[in-house]
Structures are given as structure tokens and as C-alpha cells.
């Protein structure tokens, strides 16, 4: 992501939408709302559905004609057999399990895909009031009501590197990741906040050797690249979006800071 990306500034408009959805979701956090199970047995709540309804409405108003693939809609009705060159990926509440536990690591996400790449995106963490989004000048972080702050991913440190990992990562798998990628510390964390932490230089690597969906990471991937970081397959190959024939499922990936 760079100043040559004409779509990067769309991230600001997307952040307006994710922040509006966050304001809708936040009162439902720690409210004892009912949790339902989706077809794949993953949890879904009223907050997921309310956030998605608002986001879909706002995207239709601001970007008419651009297709949208969203998590809850896909869960209920399935994903399309094909998608065009340009479309949005929406996860209205990434980190639903954290949300249910009362943890703060859940996010609202919108990513714009063009020709298989994330070209704009916004991520908002309702519990902290923080947003990260793409601009033509790079990745930006802002607190609710505060000024924009340009953020940059850091280079791999000479000392101890920090990895962000899933709460469900088993110890034996953690040791295998340490051996492969050479980080020193690991910090459990949910949702796309992991990508934003690397984008702002607070961590160094997020190795994901497990299942995710495209909407889980598209927005955070856009922010990370805009901040000078990168996300690729474990072998370093570019990470593609729009995998309609695979149900928009991701393979393994590794997110890192600056080269």
C-alpha cells in the first residue's frame, strides 16, 4: 500500500462506517445477550447481526453497485460461486468468542478487494474506541474523537521479537511456530487487532497455521500493508482474495512487520 494506491483513502469512509457500527455494538457487550450457534457451530449474537445490517446499509448508500461478502450473510445463505474484480469483505464482529467472554479484543472490519488484493480497509475496536484505517499517506490510528496518528510497522528487532497468537494455540504448536519463525515472546490475542498491533509497531509477527475466512483478515491486511508490513503464505507467496470456488476460505498465512 502506498501513495500510488488510488483506493487507499476509501479507508477513511470505511472507518466512519465501522465506528458507527461499533457504537451500535458496544452497549450489547457484557449485557448478557443470548448466544446462538451457526451451522458450523461457531457462536453468533445479536451484536453480530445488528452490526452487519448497519454496515450493509451504509455500504449500499456510499458505494452502490459494489458487491459485498459478509460473514453472517454468508453463514446463513452461503457464498456466491463467483465474484467480480472489486468487492467488499465484511466481518461485523471479529472475535465473537472474546466478545462473549467480556474481553476487549473484538473488532468491526471492512476491507475493499481489487483484483485479489486488499486496497483499502478499516478496523474498529469498540471496547477501546480505537480505529485503524488506510489513507493515501499510509495507515492511520485514531481514538474516538481524537486526531489521526500515522502508524508504521517496525522492522524485525535485533533483540526479542513478539508474536501474537490465538488463545486456542496448543503449547506443542506454539513450540513448532517458535522453531520455524524465531520469535521470543508470544502474546495471546483475539481478532484482527493482532494485525493492527503489528501495523502500529507493537508486535512483530502473527503466524496463523489454522483456518480463517477472507473477511476475518481483509481489513487488517489492508491496514498492515498500508503501514509497511506484509502478509503472505508461510512460503512467502502473495496472499490472494476472491477465492469463491473455495468458499472464501484462507490457507495458512504469516503477517509480519516491515522488511
PLM ranges: what are they?
Residues 110-196, 244-259:
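Acidic beta-strand-loop-alpha-helix segment within the catalytic core
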Residues 84-127:
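Glycine-rich active-site/cofactor-binding loop and its immediate structural neighborhood
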Residues 1-16, 175-180, 195-259:
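Oxyanion/phosphate-interacting regions
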Residues 25, 48, 59, 96, ...:
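Residue-level signal for inorganic ion chemistry
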Residues 51, 108, 194-195, 220:
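Short, hydrophobic alpha-helical packing/hinge segments within bilobed ligand-binding/sensory domains
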Residues 1-93, 176-179, 237:
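N-terminal subdomain of lithium-sensitive/metallo-dependent phosphomonoesterases centered on the IMPase/IPPase/PAP
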Amino acid at each position: 500500500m502506498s501513495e500510488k494506491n488510488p483506493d487507499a483513502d476509501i479507508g477513511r469512509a470505511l472507518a466512519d462506517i465501522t465506528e458507527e457500527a461499533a457504537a451500535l455494538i458496544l452497549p450489547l457487550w457484557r449485557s448478557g445477550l443470548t448466544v446462538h450457534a451457526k451451522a458450523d457451530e461457531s457462536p453468533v449474537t445479536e451484536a453480530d447481526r445488528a452490526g452487519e445490517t448497519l454496515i450493509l446499509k451504509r455500504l449500499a448508500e456510499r458505494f452502490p453497485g459494489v458487491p459485498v461478502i459478509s460473514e453472517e450473510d454468508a453463514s446463513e445463505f452461503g457464498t456466491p460461486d463467483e465474484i467480480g474484480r472489486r468487492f467488499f469483505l465484511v466481518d461485523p464482529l471479529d472475535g465473537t468468542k472474546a466478545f462473549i467472554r467480556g474481553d476487549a479484543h473484538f473488532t468491526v472490519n471492512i476491507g475493499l478487494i481489487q483484483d485479489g488484493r486488499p486496497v483499502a480497509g478499516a478496523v474498529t475496536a469498540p471496547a477501546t474506541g480505537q480505529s485503524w484505517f488506510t489513507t493515501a499517506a499510509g495507515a492511520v490510528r485514531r481514538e474516538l474523537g481524537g486526531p489521526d496518528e500515522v502508524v508504521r510497522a517496525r522492522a524485525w528487532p535485533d533483540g526479542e521479537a513478539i508474536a501474537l497468537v490465538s488463545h486456542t494455540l496448543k503449547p506443542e504448536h506454539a513450540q513448532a511456530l517458535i522453531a520455524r519463525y524465531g520469535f521470543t515472546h508470544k502474546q495471546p490475542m483475539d481478532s484482527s487487532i493482532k494485525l493492527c498491533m503489528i501495523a502500529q509497531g507493537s508486535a512483530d509477527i502473527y503466524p496463523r497455521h489454522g483456518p480463517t475466512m477472507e473477511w476475518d483478515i481483509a481489513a487488517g491486511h489492508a491496514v498492515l500493508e498500508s503501514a509497511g508490513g506484509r502478509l503472505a503464505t508461510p512460503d512467502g507467496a502473495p496472499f490472494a482474495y476472491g477465492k469463491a470456488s473455495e468458499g472464501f476460505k484462507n490457507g495458512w498465512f504469516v503477517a509480519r512487520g516491515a522488511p
